[in-house]
């Protein structure tokens, strides 16, 4: 029997800004014939995910949860500790239900590009400054719970030099999605 996966997250899981065929999660699903349930919702925060965790994860009885959260929290000026606490609650809940957990560390953003192409906001700098801290805290969680992870932040750390991978400074275009797919396939292949 093949594994059932739930991918829980925000627009970075959903595939905002690209056709479904170009979304990295859908590429994993079709390339490797995986049973993946994409529970990415545009704009979702870790608090939102916590609220819908029972319905979107536990009630689907997956073997494996891929969880990536934090960007929208930071774009809402929420502290990293709040994000990490929410993610840890979801990790514990999944593990207590015999669900293996993989963590996704969100990619970097390009504040200037986001201000120009997504929407004007004074929170991009806060997000940009705190993504490295979130990355470190998520790596600590992965170590504490012996979890597998994909570090999309390190992949896009020099985001300004990789602006050709972004739709709007936050969301990745088909080329960026393909980079996430190539990185993620090592964990799922």
Per-segment meaning from a language model:
Residues 1-48, 52-61:
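Serine-esterase "nucleophile elbow" of acetyl-processing enzymes
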Residues 31, 51-189:
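Alpha-helical cap/lid subdomain in secreted, periplasmic
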């Amino acid at each position: 029997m093949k594994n059932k996966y739930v991918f829980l997250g925000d627009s970075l899981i959903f595939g905002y800004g690209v056709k479904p065929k170009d979304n990295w999660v859908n590429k994993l699903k079709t390339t490797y014939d995986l049973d993946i349930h994409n529970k990415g919702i545009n704009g979702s925060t870790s608090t939102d995910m916590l609220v819908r965790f029972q319905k979107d994860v536990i009630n689907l009885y997956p073997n494996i949860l891929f969880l990536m959260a934090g960007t929208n929290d930071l774009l809402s000026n929420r502290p990293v500790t709040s994000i990490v606490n929410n993610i840890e609650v979801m990790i514990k809940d999944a593990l207590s239900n015999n669900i293996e957990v993989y963590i996704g560390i969100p990619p970097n953003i390009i504040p200037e590009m986001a201000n120009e192409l997504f929407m004007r906001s004074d929170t991009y700098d806060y997000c940009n400054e705190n993504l490295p801290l979130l990355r470190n805290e998520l790596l600590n969680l992965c170590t504490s719970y012996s979890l597998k992870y994909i570090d999309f932040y390190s992949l896009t750390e020099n985001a300004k030099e990789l602006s050709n991978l972004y739709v709007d400074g936050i969301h990745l275009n088909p080329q960026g999605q393909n980079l996430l797919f190539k990185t993620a396939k090592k964990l799922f292949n």
